[in-house]
Amino acid sequence: MSELKDCPLQFHDFKSVDHLKVCPRYTAVLARSEDDGIGIEELDTLQLELETLLSSASRRLRVLEAETQILTDWQDKKGDRRFLKLGRDHELGAPPKHGKPKKQKLEGKAGHGPGPGPGRPKSKNLQPKVQEYEFTDDPIDVPRIPKNDAPNRFWASVEPYCADITSEEVRTLEELLKPPEDEAEHYKIPPLGKHYSQRWAQEDLLEEQKDGARAAAVADKKKGLMGPLTELDTKDVDALPKKSEAQHEQPEDGCPFGALTQRLLQALVEENIISPMEDSPIPDMSGKESGADGASTSPRNQNKPFSVPHTKSLESRIKEELIAQGLLESEDRPAEDSEDEVLAELRKRQAELKALSAHNRTKKHDLLRLAKEEVSRQELRQRVRMADNEVMDAFRKIMAARQKKRTPTKKEKDQAWKTLKERESILKLLDG
C-alpha cells in the first residue's frame, strides 16, 4: 500500500470531445451517404473542426506519454534506492547469519559492489545505476493548435492593391506616357518589291546565260572557233530587260509585233538565243560573193526594221482571245502604289493599333490624374492622423486636470479648441 501511495502518477481524467456540439459539420458529413459528397463551401468549416479534433488527440497523446515516462523513471528510481540501501547496510557491518560464511566475502567486497549470494536482491530490482531525476508536478502544456495561415496569405496578396501610392509609382506612370522612340517604325509601309514575273524572267535569263557559257566552254575545247561569239558577261543579264523595254518603247527600231504576240510566240516556240549554234557555218565575208549579196547580210541592214502589216489588229485580236479563254485578265496588273489585299490588311491593322494606342494613352492620363489626386488625399489623411494625436493629447491633459480636481487652464482649453478646429478644416478638405 505504501508503494501505491508513493506513486507519482496523476491519473488525468480525459474529457472526450462532444462531436455534436463542437464539430456539427463533421458529424453531419459522417451521417451522409457516399453519393452526397462534400461541397466546396463546407471545406473551411471541416478544416477547422478537424484541426480541433487533432489538437484534442495530440493533447491526450502527450499526457499519456508523460505518464508513461513518469512511471518508467519512478520504477528506475525505486530500484536504485533499494540497491543503495542494501549497500549502506553492508558498509555498517551488519552481523551475518549462521551457516552462511559467504557473507564475509560480501562484506570484504562491499566497496566494489555486491557479489552473488543468498542476500542478493531479486534480479528484476537489480538494474544498472542511472542518473536520478527530480519530478515536479508541473502543469502539462496544452499543445498549440496548428496555425491557419490562409488569411495571412490572402491579406498579403491583397495588400499591394490597397497600399498607399508612392512617388516612384507616379514617376513610372509619367515615363509610360512618354512616346517611344520607335513608334514611327510601326507605321511604316515597306516598299513594294519587284513583281514575280520580272524576277522570274531575270532568273531565267541568268540560267540561260550559265547554260550558254557552259556550252561555249565545251565548244571552245572542241573547235576553238565559237568561243568569242558565244561569250556573255553576267552584266548582260541586267542589260537584256532594259534593251527589251527600249525596243518596246521604240517599235520602229525593233520588232514590230506587240508584247502579247511576242509572249505567245515565246511560249509556243522553244528557242535558246544564247547557246551556240554548232551546226551553223561562219559566213565568209571575203570574196566576190560578198559583192552582190553582202548588202542584204550586212550588220547595217540587219538593224533596219522590217515592216509587217496589221500588227496592231493582230495584237488586239490576240488579247481578246486570251481574255475570252481566261488566260489573261481584262485589267492590267495594278501599279505599285495602288491598293492590294496585303496593303489593305496592313493599313487596317495599323489603324487598329493607332486606336488602341490612343485609348491606352487616354487611360494612362486618367490613371496619372487619379494617382496625383490620391497622393494629395494621402497627405491629408496623414495630417488627420497627426491632428487626432494632438486632440488625444489635449484630451488627456484635460482629464488629468479633472482627476486632480482642478479646473483646466485657459491655455489648455485654447489648445484643445485649436486642434479641434484644425482637424475639422482638414476633414472638410478631405471630403471636398
From Swiss-Prot:
GO BP term (any one): regulation of transcription by RNA polymerase II
Main location: nucleus
Modification type N6-acetyllysine: residues: K418
Renumbered residue ranges of the record's region Disordered: 87-127, 211-257, 271-319
Basic and acidic residues: bias regions: 211-223, 232-251
Secreted keyword on record: no
Location of the protein in the cell: Nucleus
CC per GO annotation: nucleus; SAGA complex
The keyword Nucleus is assigned to this record: yes
Residue stretches of biased makeup (Polar residues): 295-305
Molecular function via GO: transcription coactivator activity
Domain of life (superkingdom): Eukaryota
Positions of post-translational Phosphoserine modification: S280, S298
Recorded coiled-coil stretches: 40-69, 367-407
Cross-link Glycyl lysine isopeptide (Lys-Gly) (interchain with G-Cter in SUMO2) mapped to chain: K21, K129
Alphabetic keyword roster: Acetylation, Coiled coil, Isopeptide bond, Nucleus, Phosphoprotein, Transcription, Transcription regulation, Ubl conjugation
Assigned protein family: Belongs to the NGG1 family.
Protein function: Functions as a component of the PCAF complex. The PCAF complex is capable of efficiently acetylating histones in a nucleosomal context. The PCAF complex could be considered as the human version of the yeast SAGA complex. Also known as a coactivator for p53/TP53-dependent transcriptional activation. Component of the ATAC complex, a complex with histone acetyltransferase activity on histones H3 and H4.
Quaternary data: The PCAF complex is composed of a number of TBP-associated factors (TAFS), such as TAF5, TAF5L, TAF6, TAF6L, TAF9, TAF10 and TAF12, PCAF, and also PCAF-associated factors (PAFs), such as TADA2L/ADA2, TADA3L/ADA3 and SPT3. Interacts directly with TADA2L and PCAF and also with the high-risk HPV oncoprotein E6. Component of the STAGA transcription coactivator-HAT complex, at least composed of SUPT3H, GCN5L2, TAF5L, TAF6L, SUPT7L, TADA3L, TAD1L, TAF10, TAF12, TRRAP and TAF9. Component of the TFTC-HAT complex.
Full protein name: Transcriptional adapter 3
Biological source species: Pongo abelii (Sumatran orangutan)
